[in-house]
């Protein structure tokens, strides 16, 4: 899982990008790199195998400067973990550079096509062909934005991209088809990242790109379109997390810190959702799911991956015991391939900490096509799953940086209890029952 960052603004870009990359280290990586355009419109790249400190040493020995650029932490998929294969990658002219999270499935076919028009490749990666493909379409369209958009239509696979062209000053184009891309909004400055924590100390105002969308970012504005050039209005949200929650705060590592944050995540997830006077449970983000729907549901199916799937397994017992509704649990990657039986009397419950888990999103879409309602338990407001679900129980656990889930899992368990209590809270739920739970 690679990490991408980008910045356009008035600050010195190198220390800012290095700091953002450091906050993406939890995703895992084997190399790192940065590309910056300086005031003379020269594009400079520094890359290093291994840890981020190796890249910092390369930059110390060979400094670079500028006010916009992109950075990357790579986890090798195509090509060995070497400096040569580290991102960013450039085209033949050396003026277009790309960082990429994902996999291009048809890169070998595209590579052969590009070789026929004299493109020269210097790495073993699938990413490099993207820069060359944009270069090729730039010759045809003479417009960077159009060239990027046309190139995207040729790619098969999943990809999150940040792209710069040294001949287009103060511009970054960010693209999403699968992996998450977050755009941060500042005062005449904009940020691109794979996740919220890297940019949290710089801005609280963000939006997520949707699949098949691209953001054209310059120093003054950001504009979003789809791959067909249709304008898209992004949904901007304000992140309420305290930036300190994305720091270790004196703990030896994030996992230990997040273990100690579990009581807070439980409290914040329950906050204002249970009336101790009446015993009523309130789920406040049910966009298209009513009390009448809950009374109609005859079964619940849970689809999730990883830790969220384990939460779902435990949640099955909670919901069946409390709400007396039959519950089945599926691993999200298998859900849509087993031809599930669902209709308007079925509720699909999808669980995802990030709200961007690809297989869980696919399960949600499958269920909605079959006429079922979809409810999400999620930790990230504005994420893809939250946007597409008919209702959401936000867990309010704050950013979870540790790879082994702790507080996010605990908050999911609380949300599952709330869901189990909800259908009966407006009929026969008593305060002793709440206290016993």
Predicted regions and their residues:
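Conserved short alpha-helical segments that host acidic/polar catalytic motifs at enzyme active sites
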Residues: 1-253, 261-298, 337
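Alpha-helix N-cap/helix-start and coil->helix boundary motif
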Residues: 104, 127-128, 309, 316, ...
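Conserved core segment of the aminotransferase class I/II
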Residues: 111-112, 424-426
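An acidic-aromatic substrate-binding cleft motif
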Residues: 258
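Glycine-rich phosphate-binding loops that contact phosphosugars or nucleotide phosphates
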Residues: 295-425
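Single conserved hydrophobic/aromatic residue that forms the stacking wall/gate
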Residues: 428-437
